[in-house]
Amino acid sequence: MSMFLDTAKISVQAGRGGDGMVAFRREKYVPNGGPWGGDGGKGGSVIFRVDEGLRTLMDFRYNRKFKAKSGEKGMTKGMHGRGAEDLIVFVPQGTTVRDAETGKVITDLVEHGQEVVIAKGGRGGRGNIRFATPRNPAPEIAENGEPGEERQLELELKILADVGLVGFPSVGKSTLLSVVSSAKPKIGAYHFTTIVPNLGMVRTKSGDSFAMADLPGLIEGASQGIGLGTQFLRHIERTRVILHVIDMSASEGRDPYEDYVSINNELETYNLRLMERPQIIVANKMDMPEAQENLKAFKKKLAAQYDEFDDLPMIFPISSLAHQGLENLLEATAELLAKTDEFLLYDEADLVDEEAYYGFAETEKDFEITRDDDATWVLSGEKLERLFVMTNMERDESIMKFARQLRGMGVDEALRERGAKDGDLVRIGKFEFEFVD
C-alpha cells in the first residue's frame, strides 16, 4: 500500500537582493567621472503553486529546505543586476500552510493553479548613481542587497472529498467504499485496518458523481489524540456531507446508539463546525442477526432526542457485503450534496491577512535596546537590522549614512536615556562601535 503523508515541516528562504555597485565613469570636467554604479537585482521569492496531480506531501519528506536564488550585483555603466527567478514549489490541493512559530494559518490552497508568495525575495541594493546630489556629486555609497525572508512552515494536507465516512473501527466503512467506487482500500477483520484515508469516485445511476473518503476509524478520545487521533479527524473538515456508518449488528458488543453519540461527541469536540455538516446515518450489516431489532431500538432512542420528527437525521439500512440498500443511499447523498454549500474551515481572525504576498502580520518595531553582561549595549529590531545588513561597512560614506539613519530613528537619544556614555560599546549583530555622545 502506498504511504500517505499528510503533514510536513519545511523551511523556505527567499533569495537575497544583489548588492549595488560603486563605480565611476571617466569623463572630463565631471568629478571622478560621475557615479555609474547600477542597482542589484531582486532576490527570488518562494511561491507555492497548487498542482491537482499531486496527492500527498511525500516529496516534502525527502526535501525539507527550499531556497530561492539571489539577485545579481549591480554593474558599471549604470546597469542593473539581473533579478533572480522565483522558486516555484508545487503542493497538492487541500494543503494548509501554517507559520511554525506562531501556529497562524498563512493560506489554504484549494484551487488548481492557485499561487501564493510564501517568502518574499529581498530587493536589490541601490548603486551609487542613486545617491548623487548637488552637495555630493560623486558619492562612494552603495547598498548591500536586502536579505530574503526565511520562514519555518508546517504543511497539512486534508484530502478533498465531498463525502466522508466516519464511525468506529470495523463498522464497514472500507467495505462500503469498495463496493460503491473503484477504490481498493485494505479490508480486514481487525481494528484500524484503515490507517490512511482512502478516496474513491462514486457515480450514481442517475449520473451524479462525487468523491467519497473512507477515513480511519474513530474511538472515544480521538479529539484528544487517542487512537489515530486528530491526524485523521482533520480530513473530515473538508467534507460537505458526513455518512455516519454504524454496525447495527452490534458484533463488537457495543450499543449502536452509544456508538453514534460517542462519535458525534468527538466531532463536536474537535471542531464545532463539523456538527453543522448534514449527516446521513448508515445502518450497516443489516443482513446480520439481531440487526433489525437493534435498528428499532436505535430509532426509538434517536427520536427521544428530537422535538420535531422532521429534524431527525435520515437513516438508510444497508448491507455493504450483500449490496443491499446502496442505490437509495447514494441517490440521497447526491441530492444532499447538491443543496449543501462548502463550509468555512477557519474564522477570518485566524487567517493572516491575505494579499498577493503573505508576509508577517506583526507590527514591525524600529529597534530595541538591551545590555549584555559585559556592559555592551545591544541594538536589535527588524527595521534596524535590515538597514544594517544593507549597509556596506567597507566604505566610510556608507557607514556615515547608516549613522545618520540611526540618529533619525532616535537610537542615539534612546541610548542616552538608558544611560549610555561616551566610549561605551554598542553592538548590532557582530558589528561593534563606540558610542559618541
Swiss-Prot record:
CC terms in the record's Gene Ontology section: cytoplasm
OCT domain boundaries: 359-437
A Pfam family the protein falls into: GTP1_OBG
EC number: 3.6.5.-
Domain Obg: 2-160
Disulphide bridges, residue numbers: none
Function description: An essential GTPase which binds GTP, GDP and possibly (p)ppGpp with moderate affinity, with high nucleotide exchange rates and a fairly low GTP hydrolysis rate. Plays a role in control of the cell cycle, stress response, ribosome biogenesis and in those bacteria that undergo differentiation, in morphogenesis control.
HAMAP family: GTPase_Obg (MF_01454)
PANTHER family given in the database record: DEVELOPMENTALLY REGULATED GTP-BINDING PROTEIN-RELATED (PTHR11702), MITOCHONDRIAL RIBOSOME-ASSOCIATED GTPASE 2 (PTHR11702:SF31)
Name the UniProt record assigns to this protein: GTPase Obg
Organism: Streptococcus pyogenes serotype M4 (strain MGAS10750)
